[in-house]
Amino acid sequence: MIRKPVVAGQFYPGTKNELEEMINSCIQHKFGPGNQIQNNEGIYGVISPHAGYVYSGPTACYSYKAISSKNPELVIILGPNHFGVGKDVATMVNAQWETPLGLVDVDSEAAKEIANNSKYIEIDEFSHSRDHSLEVQIPMLQSIFSEKFKILPIILRDQSLEMAKDVGNAVAQIAKSRNTMIVASSDFTHYEENSFAHSQDKALIEPILEMDVEKFYSVLMEKRVTACGYGAMASVMIACKNLGAVKGELLSYTTSGDVMGDTSSVVGYGAIKFI
């Protein structure tokens, strides 16, 4: 089956030329990475935001610039299930994801393998039918990688610590046997005043950089940080640590208020790499 885009023309442009122009303008944006060369050796995974490109695209480009020389065969993308449809944790098989930049194959072999290795992951295409969290990452990946790659999409309704440990370990098992990049799709604080969002997210980013998952969940709960993809970030932290990463590095943090000027109610965006 072809998984048609559900937010093309909304979160990002719906035509190839406009989308390519938009991604380039995000790179050159004052909050984007620009053309500087980044040292991207030894990166195991990244965190990237998933809002409309006009808001979070410049920050997302930091994550993608950091992995742009990698050319992986497989990109494992984990993100939250905003609509709560389908299974608690789901991947899919026998599918392609369509964007204005073309089709990307799902790695069905990897999907079956990870579903066997995990207590949580099930194969269910319906879970992926409405959500944008994985979709918005794919055009960015298509634009930076010159070689063909496959994806392993994993969407999370359950974002518990127990799930993250199970799924993180299962992701690492897949990554060990393939040339793989891992992406966690998440925004940070939602709909708070700008300075409060900055302080909340600074507190949550600290344990991410330390790759301390238990502390991450403690801060998340104690401060009630409204990061939507916390389970995706935790799973990727666990997977990357399993693969040999020792720390996270913050590449960029912005809010929609920083980018657009309305600071009364903002969403936070972080670009982080695990090395």
UniProtKB/Swiss-Prot annotation:
Q: Which Gene3D superfamilies match?
A: LigB-like
Provide the protein name: MEMO1 family protein Nmar_0215
Any Pfam family: Memo
Q: Which family does it belong to?
A: Belongs to the MEMO1 family.
What lineage is on file? Archaea, Nitrososphaerota, Nitrososphaeria, Nitrosopumilales, Nitrosopumilaceae
- Species the sequence originates in: Nitrosopumilus maritimus (strain SCM1)
Report TM segments: none
